[in-house]
Amino acid sequence: MVVLHSEITPDISYVLTAGHSCEERKFPKRVIDGVEIKKLKTNYEVVSYHGRKHQAVVVAMDKRWDLCLLQVKGVSRNIKAVPIAEEGPKRGVKYYNLAAPRGLFGRGMVLTFEGYYSGNFMAGYDTYTISTKPGSSGSSILNKDGEIVGIIFAGFPSVEKVGLSPVFASISIFVAKAYAQGELNLWKLYNMNADTTETTTQTPK
C-alpha cells in the first residue's frame, strides 16, 4: 500500500509491505551447454488496484519486524497515500484488512476482511482475529479512519482467523527512517544531475 509520495521526485512513491516479500531469492548456479548461468539481481513489480504495473526497488528492510519499504515509479499523485496512524491498535476494537490471499486479486477488486485486535503474542507481535493465507503477507491492517495500524506477515495454518503483525511502534519508526533514507538518496542523485527515474538502483557516492 502506498504510504508516502516523494517530495524530491514527482513520479516516485513509497509502498510498505512485508520484509520476506522483498528478500533476494537463492538460486543454484546452472550450467547449460557448457555455459554457467548466474542470477544477477531480483526485479520487483507492484500492481495497483487498477491493474497497472510499476517498477520498484527496495529502500530498506527490517528483518526483526519483517518490514520492507519500496520505492515505486510512476504512481499517480491522484492516488492518496495511506498514512500510518498516530495511535496504535486497541484491544477489542474492529480493524480491516485489504489482502490477496492465494493471489486472489483482480483489476478493481480487492478482498476486504475484518477482525479484532487481541493484544501482543509470542515475541511481542500484534495479534488480530483476521483470516490469513499465503498471499496475505504485506497487506495493511487499517482502522476505521483508513489509517495503517499493522502489516500482516504471518498466520497459523491450524487456526483460520489469526493474523500477526509487527508491533505498531516498529512500523511507524521503520517507515519514518526508511522514507528519510529514500529521500536522501534521491536528493543526492538530483544534486548530481543523475536520472532520478532510475530510483535508488543508483547508489550515490
Give the predicted meaning of each segment:
Residues 1-18, 26, 57, 67, ...:
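N-terminal activation segment of mature serine protease catalytic domains
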Residues 2, 131-152:
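Catalytic nucleophile loop of clan PA
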Residues 2-6, 24-36, 57-61, 71-106:
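Active-site substrate-binding loop(s) of clan PA
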Residues 3-63, 154:
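Catalytic-histidine neighborhood of serine endopeptidases
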Residues 77-126, 131-136, 152-164:
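Flexible, gly/ser-rich surface segments that form the specificity/activation loops bordering the active-site cleft
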Residues 122, 142-205:
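C-terminal subregion of chymotrypsin/trypsin-like serine protease catalytic domains
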